């Protein structure tokens, strides 16, 4: 029996040795990870670090970002930067980011120039995305009809326009306003609630804001209770479900960034720019969204991606809301249409979403908004209201531009696209039939007829 016993013992011994070797290998791997990972994270502006998302943003992370933001805003907010050419701004931005990478505040290999979309993108050391705009938001209005580098020529008499002259009443709207004086009780006092999320500028000395203030008052007179939000925050954009109609009046851009540890990839997506400035406290509060790239920081200001809306309304809270976006490149650009914004809002419960492909002319955009909402408030479906606006101002902004006498339009026409239910409309009481609404639609604008004439 000695032979079999010895064989069994040898077999047991060999298995035990293999088990010990495996344990030793695992232990060595853990030691190497513990020793080498922190060293990699500390590399000079590395960029190959922390590509796996952190679970939370620490106070230290936020403090480092604020240090970087202070340097970026000191550059972009300076008089010198305002006077620079685009090429000089690019050189200054790259020099500033090189210094921030040397200090370990941004990842050096994340710095990416996107001249087509006018920005330099980068990643903070903690993994949050950032960027520097080469064209300041305040300049975007001027670029619409600037005869300078972008080669545009202003349509005739555009400089003399006011809200009343630029946005006249169409005949059907005017007739409806006149009829209101004689049939005051034909429609419910309130036909819905709307919100204008105005984030083009801070309204001080603004060339845009008077038009939106005018529209707000006009729609109030139509029975559409309209809230004007001129200090739009990320928190505000999480509460759009309170309204029947939400208007996103803000600048938009196409943001390109690099990602990946061993193989670098690039991704481009639409973003909406806000005027809400980044602070240490807010960075911590918004930490999860920042790390998940649902929020991005440009020039020290917060911006949102499609994933922001997808996450904010993941339970479908936008039930039956109509979302109308004026932002440039909300749906991407020609030959690269990106429907992520519309898809995210529809997934969040929105009934209808409208937005632009390409950069859109300022005046065309607000004229389309004006006419669409006027007819939506008269009881028309959003599809019919949009069709009327296109019949009035043109299918795209280049058609409108040339009809105004413009001679050198921009390269790609901007056009408004509707997603979702084209039959969506504002609130109609159950006891108020469509026939009655059609008869009473003429009564809705009387309160503001005199001021709009």
What are these regions (language model features)?
Residues 255-351:
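Cysteine protease catalytic core and zymogen-processing segment of caspase-like enzymes
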Residues 322-448, 452:
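Active-site-proximal C-terminal subdomain of hydrolase catalytic domains
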Residues 34-48:
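Sec-dependent signal peptide cleavage junction
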Residues 25-35:
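Bacterial N-terminal signal peptides
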Residues 80-213, 217-218, 256:
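Non-catalytic propeptide/linker segments at domain boundaries
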Residues 15-25:
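Bacterial N-terminal signal peptides that target proteins for export
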Residues 61, 67-77, 162-283, 287:
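A domain-level signal for caspase-like cysteine endopeptidase catalytic cores
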Residues 192, 222, 241-245, 317-323, ...:
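Loop/turn elements at helix/coil->beta-strand transitions in domains of secreted/extracellular proteins
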């Amino acid at each position: 029996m000695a032979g079999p016993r010895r064989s069994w013992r040898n077999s047991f011994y060999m298995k035990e040795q293999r088990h010990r070797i495996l344990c030793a290998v695992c232990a060595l791997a853990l030691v190497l990870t513990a020793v080498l990972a922190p060293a990699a994270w500390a590399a000079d502006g590395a960029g190959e670090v922390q590509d796996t998302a952190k679970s939370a943003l620490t106070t230290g992370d936020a403090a480092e970002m604020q240090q970087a933001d202070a340097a970026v805003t000191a550059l972009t907010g300076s008089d010198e930067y305002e006077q620079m050419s685009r090429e000089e701004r690019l050189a200054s931005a790259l020099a500033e980011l090189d210094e921030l990478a040397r200090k370990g505040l941004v990842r050096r290999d994340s710095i990416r120039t996107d001249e087509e979309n006018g920005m330099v993108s980068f990643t903070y050391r903690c993994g949050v995305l950032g960027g520097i705009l080469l064209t300041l938001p305040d300049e975007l209005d001027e670029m619409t009809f600037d005869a300078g580098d972008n080669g545009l020529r202003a349509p005739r008499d555009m400089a003399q326009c006011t809200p009343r002259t630029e946005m006249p009443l169409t005949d059907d709207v005017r007739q409806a306003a006149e009829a209101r004086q004689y049939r005051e009780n034909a429609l419910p006092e309130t036909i819905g609630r709307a919100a204008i999320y105005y984030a083009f500028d801070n309204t001080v000395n603004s060339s845009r804001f008077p038009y939106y203030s005018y529209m707000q008052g006009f729609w109030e007179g139509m029975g559409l209770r309209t809230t004007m939000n001129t200090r739009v925050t990320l928190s505000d954009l999480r509460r759009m479900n309170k309204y029947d109609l939400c208007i996103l009046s803000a600048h938009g851009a196409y943001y390109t960034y690099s990602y990946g540890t061993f193989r670098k990839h690039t991704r481009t997506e639409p973003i909406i720019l806000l005027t809400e400035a980044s602070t240490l406290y807010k960075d911590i509060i918004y930490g999860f969204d920042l790390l998940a790239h649902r929020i991005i920081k440009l020039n020290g200001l917060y911006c949102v991606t499609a994933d922001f809306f997808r996450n904010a309304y993941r339970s479908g809270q936008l039930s039956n809301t109509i979302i109308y976006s004026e932002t440039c490149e909300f749906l991407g650009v020609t030959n690269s249409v990106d429907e992520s914004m519309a898809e995210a809002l529809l997934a969040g419960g929105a009934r209808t979403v409208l937005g632009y492909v390409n950069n859109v002319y300022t005046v065309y955009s607000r004229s389309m908004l004006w006419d669409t909402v006027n007819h939506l408030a008269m009881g028309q479906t959003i599809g019919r209201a949009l069709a009327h606006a296109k019949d009035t101002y043109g299918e795209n902004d280049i058609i409108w531009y040339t009809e105004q006498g413009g001679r050198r339009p921009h390269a790609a026409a901007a056009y408004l696209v509707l997603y979702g239910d084209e039959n969506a409309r504002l609130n109609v009481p159950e006891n108020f039939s469509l026939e009655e609404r059609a008869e009473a639609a003429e009564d809705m604008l009387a309160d503001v007829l005199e001021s709009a004439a």
